[in-house]
């Protein structure tokens, strides 16, 4: 596999270059290669037979976990990343559904809840195996699964998205070729490794010979701590959700002065608000900003566009860009028929980045994946349209609601609320106590203002909204907060916000 061979070459050519670093920890390319060899040999001793069962890797982003990822695939097994935010009950379901036989964990972690269901070993114990390696013909093959990411399932049980070595290689080659990330750059990692945004940091970094700078969980939740850490990092490449960088932008100190070497920002996982893009262009004039799009089932991202002031001026919402060269993206109607350019429907992705399907879930796989003109395709469940070859994503089809007979997109309403001069950030939640939407609630982080009463602020925002939205799309209720709740993955936590707002 090209990715693994590239890491091996870096280990031989630049053995003392850091592949990974975090507070007080580092791992050179030579150490990464040699330790992952030892881990692979130890794994093969623990799991006998031809069955290539998945291996759970449990912990947080640190050297031994990356060693465990590579050790697993060198031993011929896919890995399942499980970070500390995943509750034990969910881990037990993942073990049961995946058929995993081995769990590798970081030192000092309590795993009592799953200990009886699966063989467990600390990453440190694996590395006690002196010497040892496996031959390259034991590595995960191109058509075999490299990693499995578990996402939420509509049944309440997590579903495992299988990403093959070929899927990952297609993605990594694209990032290294089409984005300014090569040449030993320093990449940010802030996403937990059970979220596939972390794949955008990790593997392009390792293939290009860069250094992955992982910020601590404490820093992720505290901007002041984060900025102190980043100031010393020499960071070049920033990858995150828009929500995470929006939180950083709330501090005026987040700018090119803080990160003088930052030259590339890449966003994925959510809609990139125009206001965030504008602020970044102002704060980081030396950097290029890229909006990307893709579901986990299509290996992180499959479209991109560089965001400039010219791009911003051409449309109310930002495009997610053009398909990567080896992919085909089209729009389908409810009957599964392709739609012409400009018409709205469901985004469908076809090509070598599309997952082989859900592990052990043939019915779910058949529902979401299908063959299209000789290519494997995935129905995303995202609404969008194509204009002049560029894809515009309009959020989830299941973010569409019906209120008083009108069908509307929550994200369209959010866009207009965020455009208000009085709004720093906002989320719109439907109030539907009996399954039917009765009205809309806007949860808002306000800008500084001179109003003495909240109702005065609400009136001012509603007056602005009335200029761009019909009355039935304007939220009835406005709730003011000091921040917008986010999930461990750095996305807006709509479920939690809804629960808090409705109390």
Curated annotation (Swiss-Prot):
It comes from the Bacteria. Its main location: cytoplasm. D-alanine binds at residues 196, 300, 491. One of its GO terms (molecular function) is ATP binding. Pathway: Cell wall biogenesis; lipoteichoic acid biosynthesis. Keywords: ATP-binding, Cytoplasm, Ligase, Nucleotide-binding. InterPro entries: AA_adenyl_dom, AMP-bd_C, AMP-bd_C_sf, AMP-binding_CS, AMP-dep_synth/lig_dom, ANL_N_sf, DltA, DltA-like. One of its GO terms (biological process) is lipoteichoic acid biosynthetic process. It catalyses: holo-[D-alanyl-carrier protein] + D-alanine + ATP = D-alanyl-[D-alanyl-carrier protein] + AMP + diphosphate. Its EC number is 6.2.1.54. One of its GO terms (cellular component) is cytoplasm. Pfam families: AMP-binding, AMP-binding_C. Belongs to the ATP-dependent AMP-binding enzyme family. DltA subfamily. Catalyzes the first step in the D-alanylation of lipoteichoic acid (LTA), the activation of D-alanine and its transfer onto the D-alanyl carrier protein (Dcp) DltC. In an ATP-dependent two-step reaction, forms a high energy D-alanyl-AMP intermediate, followed by transfer of the D-alanyl residue as a thiol ester to the phosphopantheinyl prosthetic group of the Dcp. D-alanylation of LTA plays an important role in modulating the properties of the cell wall in Gram-positive bacteria, influencing the net charge of the cell wall. This is D-alanine--D-alanyl carrier protein ligase. It comes from Bacillus subtilis (strain 168). The lineage of its organism: Bacteria, Bacillati, Bacillota, Bacilli, Bacillales. The gene is dltA.
């Amino acid at each position: 596999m090209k990715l693994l061979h590239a890491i091996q070459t870096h280990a031989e050519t630049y053995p003392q270059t850091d592949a990974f670093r975090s507070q007080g920890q580092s791992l050179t390319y030579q150490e990464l290669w040699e330790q992952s060899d030892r881990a692979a040999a130890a794994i093969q001793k623990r799991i006998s037979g031809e069955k290539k069962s998945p291996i759970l890797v449990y912990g947080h982003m640190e050297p031994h976990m990356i060693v465990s990822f590579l050790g697993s695939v060198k031993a011929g097994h896919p890995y399942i990343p499980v970070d500390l935010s995943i509750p034990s009950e969910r881990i037990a379901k993942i073990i049961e559904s995946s058929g995993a036989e081995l769990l590798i964990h970081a030192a000092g972690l309590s795993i009592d809840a799953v200990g009886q269901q699966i063989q467990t070993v600390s990453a440190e114990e694996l590395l006690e195996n002196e010497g040892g390696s496996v031959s390259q013909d034991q590595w995960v093959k191109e058509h075999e699964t490299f990693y499995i990411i578990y996402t939420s399932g509509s049944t309440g049980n997590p579903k495992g998205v299988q990403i093959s070595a070929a899927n990952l290689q297609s993605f990594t080659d694209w990032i290294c070729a089409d984005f300014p990330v090569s040449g030993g750059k320093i990449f940010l990692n802030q996403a937990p490794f059970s979220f596939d945004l972390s794949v955008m940091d990790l593997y392009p970094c390792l293939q290009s010979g860069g250094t992955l700078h992982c910020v601590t969980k404490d820093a992720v939740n505290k901007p002041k701590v984060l900025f102190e850490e980043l100031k010393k990092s020499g960071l070049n490449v920033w990858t995150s959700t828009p929500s995470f960088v929006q939180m950083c932008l709330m501090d005026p100190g987040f700018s090119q002065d803080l990160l003088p070497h930052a030259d590339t920002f890449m966003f994925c996982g959510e809609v990139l608000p125009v206001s965030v893009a504008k602020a970044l262009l102002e704060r980081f004039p030396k950097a290029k900003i890229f909006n990307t799009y893709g579901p986990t089932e299509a290996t992180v991202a499959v479209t991109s566009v560089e965001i400039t002031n010219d791009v911003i001026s051409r449309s109310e919402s930002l495009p997610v860009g053009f398909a990567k060269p080896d992919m085909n993206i089209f729009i389908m109607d409810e009957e599964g028929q392709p739609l012409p350019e400009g018409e709205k429907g469901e985004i469908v992705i076809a090509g070598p980045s599309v997952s082989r399907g859900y592990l052990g879930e043939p019915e779910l796989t058949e529902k979401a994946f299908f063959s299209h003109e000789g290519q494997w395709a995935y129905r995303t469940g995202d609404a969008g349209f194509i204009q002049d070859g560029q894809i515009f994503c309009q959020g989830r089809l299941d973010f569409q609601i019906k209120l008083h007979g009108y069908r509307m997109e929550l994200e369209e309403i959010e866009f207009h609320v965020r455009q208000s001069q009085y709004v720093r950030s906002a989320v719109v939640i439907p109030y539907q106590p009996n399954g039917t939407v009765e009205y809309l609630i806007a949860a808002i982080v306000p800008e500084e203002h001179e109003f003495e009463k909240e109702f005065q602020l609400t009136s001012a925002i509603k007056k602005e909204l009335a200029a761009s939205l019909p009355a039935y799309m304007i939220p009835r209720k406005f709730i003011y907060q000091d921040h917008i709740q986010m999930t461990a993955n750095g996305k807006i936590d709509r479920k939690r916000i809804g629960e808090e707002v409705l109390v």
